[in-house]
């Protein structure tokens, strides 16, 4: 079986906090606090990115330097990441040091000082660097544009702070107050004893976080199809398609993504990447073609779209996808379960399209 018998998984609630843990006979543990505070929930463009960059700055009880040095002495590391759904605070450490890291993450969530000088000297420069790096990748640019034209708001919000909309320190504090609540976060541990984690969480500042409400969307997001955008870019050219996916069709598009990027498909050599981004209320399937030569990109995207419009039998990739999905779920605290029973065929209908790079020599949507 894919689920190792030695792994114990439990999920419960500590004063309305969702806590999950898996134990395993290894020395290294990880602790993650996943907050539903990603860019889709942003009250202003980029505020989630700036809040994410404020994590592990000075708190009311520890300086940022002290936090890093304490963790280094214990041999551990901290990291804070952002995506469209979550701000995730993560620590990796030796198993016996769990109490320290529970308290450290709780301290960040509950007592970040939000000093004005940190915004100008640390947070904004780091956020601008993130944005500059992302802007150098034409695939990343195409992906962001696909989200924007597909969903417009919510999932279509900019992932990173670009400085277009002014975000003040008070805006960041207010957003933190909105998302850093008991009902809006999940605590998970890998190679952690479940009973110990629940006890340490209960004894930490996490249990005193203010009450609020879960921001998790319960309804399917509004989306648009047949949209197009074109972005001039010096470098490689990219042609990308995006398809919004409802919850019932997630399994089909998961199989499609694996099929198109494997040796099972004759199109795999033409495709740079294809994936399904899954959310609790749906998803977005994206496919990218990238090359230095815009003529190659143009030819390949036309071949791919024409072939997908004819229809594809996905059955050869179902078992492969089941295996891959099961392995991935082993490392996810709250996986989105997929039912592959009804997956058979796929035929491309309406989709959204983005061209990045030498757009004068890339096709338009109505040419595909």
From Swiss-Prot:
PANTHER family membership: CYTOCHROME B-C1 COMPLEX SUBUNIT 2, MITOCHONDRIAL, METALLOPROTEASE
Miscellaneous comment as given in the Swiss-Prot or TrEMBL entry: Present with 35700 molecules/cell in log phase SD medium.
GO biological processes: aerobic respiration; cellular respiration; mitochondrial electron transport, ubiquinol to cytochrome c; proteolysis; proton transmembrane transport
Location of the transit peptide in the chain: 1-16
Keyword rRNA processing part of the UniProt annotation: no
TM region positions: none
Function, as annotated: Component of the ubiquinol-cytochrome c oxidoreductase, a multisubunit transmembrane complex that is part of the mitochondrial electron transport chain which drives oxidative phosphorylation.
Keywords per UniProt: Electron transport, Membrane, Mitochondrion, Mitochondrion inner membrane, Phosphoprotein, Respiratory chain, Transit peptide, Transport
Membrane topology, as annotated: Peripheral membrane protein
GO cellular component terms, semicolon-separated: mitochondrial crista; mitochondrial inner membrane; mitochondrion; respiratory chain complex III
GO MF annotations, alphabetized: metal ion binding; metalloendopeptidase activity
Major location category of this protein: mitochondrion
In-chain residues carrying the UniProt-annotated modification Phosphoserine: 141, 168
Protein name as catalogued: Cytochrome b-c1 complex subunit 2, mitochondrial
Quaternary structure, from the entry: Component of the ubiquinol-cytochrome c oxidoreductase (cytochrome b-c1 complex, complex III, CIII), a multisubunit enzyme composed of 10 subunits. The complex is composed of 3 respiratory subunits cytochrome b (COB), cytochrome c1 (CYT1) and Rieske protein (RIP1), 2 core protein subunits COR1 and QCR2, and 5 low-molecular weight protein subunits QCR6, QCR7, QCR8, QCR9 and QCR10.
Family that this chain belongs to: Belongs to the peptidase M16 family. UQCRC2/QCR2 subfamily.
Location in or out of the cell: Mitochondrion inner membrane
């Amino acid at each position: 079986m894919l689920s190792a018998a030695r792994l114990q998984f439990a999920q419960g609630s500590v004063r309305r906090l969702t806590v999950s843990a898996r134990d395993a006979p290894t020395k290294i543990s990880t602790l993650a606090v996943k907050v539903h505070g990603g860019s889709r929930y942003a009250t202003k463009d980029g505020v989630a990115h700036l809040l994410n960059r404020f994590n592990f700055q000075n708190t009311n009880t520890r300086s940022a330097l002290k936090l890093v040095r304490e963790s280094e002495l214990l041999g551990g590391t901290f990291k804070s990441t952002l995506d469209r759904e979550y701000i995730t605070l993560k620590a990796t450490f030796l198993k016996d040091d769990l109490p320290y890291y529970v308290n450290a993450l709780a301290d960040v969530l509950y007592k970040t000082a939000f000093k004005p000088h940190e915004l100008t000297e640390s947070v904004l420069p780091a956020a601008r660097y993130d944005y500059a790096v992302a802007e150098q990748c034409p695939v990343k640019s195409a992906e962001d544009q696909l989200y924007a034209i597909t969903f417009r708001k919510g999932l279509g919000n900019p992932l990173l702070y670009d400085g277009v909309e002014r975000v003040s320190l008070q805006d960041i504090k207010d957003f933190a107050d909105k998302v850093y609540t008991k009902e809006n976060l999940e605590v998970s541990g890998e190679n952690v004893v479940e009973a110990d984690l629940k006890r340490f969480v209960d004894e930490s500042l996490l249990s005193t976080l203010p009450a609020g409400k879960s921001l998790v969307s319960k309804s399917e997001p509004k989306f648009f199809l047949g949209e197009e955008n074109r972005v001039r870019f010096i470098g490689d050219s990219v042609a990308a398609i995006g398809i919004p996916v409802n919850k019932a069709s997630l399994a089909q598009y998961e199989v499609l993504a694996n099929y198109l990027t494997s040796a099972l498909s004759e199109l795999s050599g033409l495709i740079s990447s294809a994936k399904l981004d899954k959310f609790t209320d749906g998803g977005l399937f994206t496919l990218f073609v990238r090359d230095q030569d815009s003529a190659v990109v143009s030819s390949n995207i036309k071949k791919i779209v024409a072939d997908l419009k004819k229809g594809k039998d996905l059955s050869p990739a179902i078992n492969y996808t089941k295996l891959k999905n099961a392995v991935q779920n082993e490392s996810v605290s709250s996986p989105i379960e997929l039912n592959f029973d009804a997956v058979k065929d796929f035929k491309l209908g309406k989709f959204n399209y983005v061209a990045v790079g030498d757009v004068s020599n890339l096709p338009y949507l109505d040419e595909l």
